[in-house]
Amino acid sequence: MNNRTLLGLSLLTLSVSTGQAAMAAGEKGEGFIEGSSLTILNRNLYFNRDFRKGQSSSSGNGYSEEWAHGVIGRFESGFTEGTIGFGVDAFAMLGLKLDTGDGRSGAGGTVDVMPYNSLGQAEDNYSKLGGAVKTRFMDTEIKVGDVFPVSPVVHYGDARLLPESFRGVTVVNSSVEGLSLQGGRLHSMSQPNTSSMRDGFATFYAGEVDSPWIAYFGGDYTLNDNVGFSLYTSRLKDAWNQYYAGTTLSYPLADDVALIGGLNYYKAVDEGKLNRPGFRGGLNS
C-alpha cells in the first residue's frame, strides 16, 4: 500500500500595480512603469510518503516527509512606448525548511522538496534569482533569459515548493485573430529543488535527460467559443522528436455551466541516442 499526501497552501498573495486603477481585466497599460506589476506569493507545502504497509520505496526508506515554506516574488514591467517596445521581467524566490530530518528526506528518502547536501541532509534554505529582457513589435513578443513556457510540449512545472524555469529564447505571435503561435529554443532549466539555473532537462518519458537544447513550435486556433485546435512539435537534441495534436470542446449547459472535453495525441520518436529499451521505435499516447 502506498499512502501519499501532498498538501499545498497559498497563504498570501500581494499584488502591487502602477498606472490606471480601473484598467480593464487582462489589459496592461502602455509604458514601462504604467504597465508594470509586482506579485508576492507565500506558499506552504507539506509532502508525505508512507510505504510502511507492505510496499517498499526504491530508496529502501519506509517513511518520508518534508514541510517547507516558499516565497515567490515576480516583477513584470510594461513596454516602453514606440514602434518597438522594450521591457524586463524578474523574479526572486526563497525556500525555507520548516520540518524534516535524517531518513525522512534528501538522499536517504523519497521526497525531494528541499535540496540536500553531501551528507544527504536537507538544506535549511535555498533561493532562485533570474530574469529576462523582452521586446514587442506589433503582435509579436520576444523574451530572452529565464522564461516560463506554457505549451503541450514544453511546460514549466509548478507542483512543488518553487516553480521550474527555463533559460533561452521564446517568441509569441497573435497577428491572426483566433490564432496564437509560439516557439522557442531553451538550453537549460532550473529544477524545483535547486538554486542552479543550468540543470538538465526533466522529462515525462525518461526523467532527467542530458541534452544541449530543446526547441519547440506550434499554435492554438480558436474556431469559436466552443471549439479549438492545437498543433505542436518539439525536438530534444540527441533524445527525441515529439509531435502533438489536440482539440478543446465546450458545450454550454446553462449561462454559467458548461461541459468541457477534448482529445490529445502525442507521438515521440527516438533519435537513437537515448539508449532506453522501452523507448525504441517511439511512443504514442
Where are each of the predicted segments found?
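Cleavable N-terminal export/targeting peptides
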Residues: M1-G31
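Beta-barrel outer-membrane channel/assembly domains of diderm bacteria
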Residues: Q20-P149
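Residues on the lipid-exposed face of transmembrane beta-strands in outer-membrane beta-barrel proteins
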Residues: I40, V71-S77, G131-T135, V169-N173, ...
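Transmembrane beta-strands of outer-membrane beta-barrel pores
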Residues: N44-N48, A90-L96, F137-D139, D146-P152, ...
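Outer-membrane beta-barrel translocator domains and adjoining extracellular loop/strand segments
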Residues: F51-S57, D99-R104, V153-L161, N193-G200, ...
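Repeated loop/turn-to-beta-strand initiation elements of outer-membrane beta-barrel proteins
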Residues: G82-G85, D139-K143, G178-Q182, S190, ...
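Solvent-exposed loop/turn segments connecting transmembrane beta-strands
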Residues: Y156-P163, M189, S211, S234-Y244
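Outer-membrane beta-barrel translocator/channel fold
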Residues: L179-Y205, D210, I214, D256-S285
